[in-house]
């Protein structure tokens, strides 16, 4: 079922009931793959609540911001593709990382911004993003670059993400990720980039986590 945000997940002795809008779905188990930011927000109610270890993991791990801005220029003014540029300016951390994309993608470069700066950019207009970045881009790629458009991620203002990647906040660590990977009453399984210790905080880690959860569930159902 599409376009039906899940609002509640209930565990019962022999099933799991997932509620979305005005409908409910019941099955022997469920895999929950929402981002850590959604779990932290409480947008989904768990009945009964998640076990203490899982709740601690959700609360202890950080969920940060790493915005991506893709800039398309009228032509390539750089010679090396897949190159990394580090910019050190008077505003520490501002537009500090740039990457040139493969030539097949066109004259496009990618820039990262983290933390509060990334959060602010994701709420900014393309015009304002371009105005702030262009002076730095010209220092890196030449004064004659001509911008065409920019597209910036909006993970922080997306209610189905609420951030970008998990990280180890003070007091948290790999044990919290391991705990999140533990099945809950053999009925509920969590998966995602924050779950497990195999390449966490990456897309690869999210895929591996999902496969692991699916394997756990298949093993249980086949037993």
Language model regions located:
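Short, structured coil/loop segments at alpha-helix boundaries
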Residues: 3, 47-52, 174, 185
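Short, well-ordered beta-to-alpha junction loops that form the rim of enzyme active sites
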Residues: 3-5, 21-22, 114
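Central helical "cap/lid" subdomain
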Residues: 10-11, 20-81, 143
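A conserved short coil-to-beta-strand element within the FAD-binding core of flavoproteins
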Residues: 2-16
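Catalytic metal-binding/acid-base residues of hydrolase active sites
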Residues: 5-6, 37, 195
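Conserved flavin/dinucleotide-binding core of flavoenzymes
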Residues: 15-17, 25-26, 65, 80-223
């Amino acid at each position: 079922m599409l376009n039906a945000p899940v609002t509640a997940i209930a565990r019962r002795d022999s099933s799991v009931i997932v509620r979305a809008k005005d409908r409910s779905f019941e099955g022997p188990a469920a895999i929950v793959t929402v981002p850590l930011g959604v779990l932290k927000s409480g947008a989904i109610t768990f009945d009964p609540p998640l076990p203490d270890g899982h709740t601690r993991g959700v609360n202890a791990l950080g969920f940060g911001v790493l915005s991506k801005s893709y800039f398309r220029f009228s032509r390539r003014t750089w010679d090396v593709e897949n190159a990394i540029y580090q910019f050190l300016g008077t505003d520490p951390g501002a537009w500090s990382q740039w990457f040139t994309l493969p030539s097949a993608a066109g004259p496009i470069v990618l820039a990262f911004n983290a933390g509060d700066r990334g959060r602010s950019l994701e709420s900014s207009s393309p015009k304002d993003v371009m105005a702030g970045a262009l002076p730095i881009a010209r220092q890196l790629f030449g004064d004659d670059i001509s911008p065409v458009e920019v597209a910036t991620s909006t993970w922080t203002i997306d209610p189905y993400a609420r951030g970008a990647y998990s990280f180890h906040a003070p007091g948290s660590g790999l044990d919290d990720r391991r705990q999140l990977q533990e099945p809950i009453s053999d009925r509920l399984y969590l998966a995602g980039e924050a779950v497990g210790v195999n390449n966490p905080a990456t897309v690869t880690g999210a895929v591996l986590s999902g496969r692991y959860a699916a394997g756990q569930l298949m093993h249980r159902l086949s037993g």
